[in-house]
Amino acid sequence: MTKIDHIRNFAIIAHIDHGKSTIADRIIHSCGGLTEREMKAQVLDSMDIERERGITIKAQTVKLNYKAKDGKDYILNIIDTPGHVDFSYEVSRSLYACEGSILIVDSTQGVEAQTLANVYQALDTKHEIVPVLNKVDLPASDLEKTKKQIEEVIGIDTENAIPCSGKTGEGIEDILEQIIVSLPAPEGEKDADLKCLLVDSWYDTYLGVVILVRVINGKISKNMKIKMMSTDQEYIIEKVGVFTPKATDVNELNAGEIGFITTGIKILSETKVGDTICDATKPPQEALPGFKPSKPVVFCGLFPVDSSEYQKLKDGLGKLQLNDASFSYEAESSSALGLGFRCGFLGLLHLEIITERLEREFDINLLTTTPGVVYKVHMNKGDIIELQNPSSLPEPTLIKFIEEPWIKATIITPDQYLGAIIKVCQDKRGVQTNLSYSGNRAVLNYEIPLNEVVFDFNDRLKSMTSGYASFDYEIIGHREGDLVKLGILVNAEPVDALSMMVHKDFAQTVGREVCEKLKDLIPRHNFMIPVQAAIGGKIIARETIKGFKKDVLTKIHGGGARDRKRKLLDKQKKGKARGKQFGKVEIPQEAFIGVLKINKDQ
């Protein structure tokens, strides 16, 4: 059995695309975790979508044996964390399970926004940090400039920063030695009563729910009776194991170690991330501090294009939620789109990945409505309603005021793009709180309503700065806003799937653009179709789709048939009026996608 002072638990943190998973692969290979034949790029990225996009979505863990230069054997527990802002919750959970972090910075790019966010999370968790400068094999690598940036922007000493290359393997041995020297061993007592932190859980077809744990005190072993402190439920442990990175069974996990257990649980919601697991016969007086559960911040409707695929979509969402408890869904019905689901996500990339997985893994054609955020509607009577769907907004006369979520945004950009970025932030109702410089890069801090960045703020930043700017945000609470519900009516019928919350100042512009877009995208019918944008009962924009005109007078010749002509024209007029009254206007899928694009262009 390994002594606790020979264990090192650490997370790998970095901005997206700075080489975390590649360096993790190199460390695994260097410690003999996998043979040359078993190695594949991004070993710890288990989903196909992770490898294709080159991003980490779920935090992955691996236990390695390492013989250091001092001749002693050590156990290294690595957690490879996601780098994208949407998955920062995965990062925070992982950091709680470790004592130290390796901070990877791309030496060709320098410090980026997500680097800052993740480092601050690590420092808040009181981590020791080892800075690593990756991609030194590239001609554009600038070590001194990157070191200076780390010291100026983050405030970490870079005297012992390790230059390395995930591609060639240079510097990997130095990283391993630095981990042993600089990072602390875990604290904990093997002989104390059991206390475990539930770090993560996921569903396995054969084993049921697999629980990733970090043993704080005591030991956890097979056939032991354990208790979840938040639910008071008791279970018998069926399996104990570690990832090497292959799942390997062990007899027990001791204080300081990270591994997995299975207990035959079939429902993921019974395992709350951050919960304390203890010995059912000796429960402790108080639980571990744990951490805040993730809350969805972006909501949208998902509808099957073919209504017969509704059950397939329901089953698909249920299966995805088994492995991703951070997104929520509930049934929703729309007069325009039929039956579907209202889903909540951690951010736009999260939304994109869930919809892509549904389409790919379950072969469902999906229609996604405009993404929105959660508003707090304060009613005249004093109660507060959390609004996810604009079509459910109560009557304006019953509302006192509406609050919308705001974020604190950090943008790091080369200084030549500063003017363009400030203009975009101002257009998005942003309030600048800070501006600082490090060399030729600017660090901007803005407070912006989340609804303004939810569509494509990141994409616009990337396109106007040729991909050099990076963006990160955290939610700072709700603030009162002058918001109205913009309703869209087609042939005097409200289309709930197209309604949206907008700021009063932009309502007319957005309404006009939506009407113009729908006029182009809805096919003509035999009768005239009005397309209107409205706030409450007031119409603020209108376009008209002209009906087809049939010449009913072609067969009538001569000048004496005036009465006959009048009768035919009146009959046609009545038919058109009846068509307008009872005719159903089919709104094609392209119209919904077109409106979504308008929101992106705003």
From Swiss-Prot:
The record's Pfam families line, in alphabetical order, gives:
EFG_C, EFG_III, GTP_EFTU, GTP_EFTU_D2, LepA_C
Q: Does the keyword Nucleus apply?
A: no
Protein location: Cell inner membrane
**How is this protein situated with respect to the membrane?**
Peripheral membrane protein
The answer to whether the entry has keyword Transferase is: no
Question: Where, in this chain's numbering, is GTP bound?
Answer: 17-22, 134-137
> Quick one: a GO cellular component term?
plasma membrane
Q: Which CDD domains match?
A: EF4_II, EF4_III, LepA, lepA_C
Reactions catalysed:
GTP + H2O = GDP + phosphate + H(+)
Q: What class of enzyme is it?
A: hydrolase
Q: Where is the tr-type G domain?
A: 5-187
Could you say which EC number(s) this protein's record lists? 3.6.5.n1
Q: Which GO terms describe its molecular function?
A: GTP binding; GTPase activity; guanosine tetraphosphate binding; ribosome binding; translation elongation factor activity
Provide a GO biological process annotation: positive regulation of translation
Listed InterPro entries? EF-4, EFG_II, EFG_III/V, EFG_V-like, EFTu-like_2, G_TR_CS, LepA_C_sf, LepA_CTD
Primary place of residence?
membrane
Q: Cite the entry's keywords alphabetically.
A: Cell inner membrane, Cell membrane, GTP-binding, Hydrolase, Membrane, Nucleotide-binding, Protein biosynthesis
- Enumerate the NCBIfam families for this protein: lepA, small_GTP
PANTHER family for this protein: TRANSLATION FACTOR GUF1 HOMOLOG, CHLOROPLASTIC (PTHR43512:SF4), TRANSLATION FACTOR GUF1-RELATED (PTHR43512)
This chain's function reads:
Required for accurate and efficient protein synthesis under certain stress conditions. May act as a fidelity factor of the translation reaction, by catalyzing a one-codon backward translocation of tRNAs on improperly translocated ribosomes. Back-translocation proceeds from a post-translocation (POST) complex to a pre-translocation (PRE) complex, thus giving elongation factor G a second chance to translocate the tRNAs correctly. Binds to ribosomes in a GTP-dependent manner.
Q: Which HAMAP family match?
A: LepA
Q: Which family does it belong to?
A: Belongs to the TRAFAC class translation factor GTPase superfamily. Classic translation factor GTPase family. LepA subfamily.
Question: What is the designated name of this protein?
Answer: Elongation factor 4
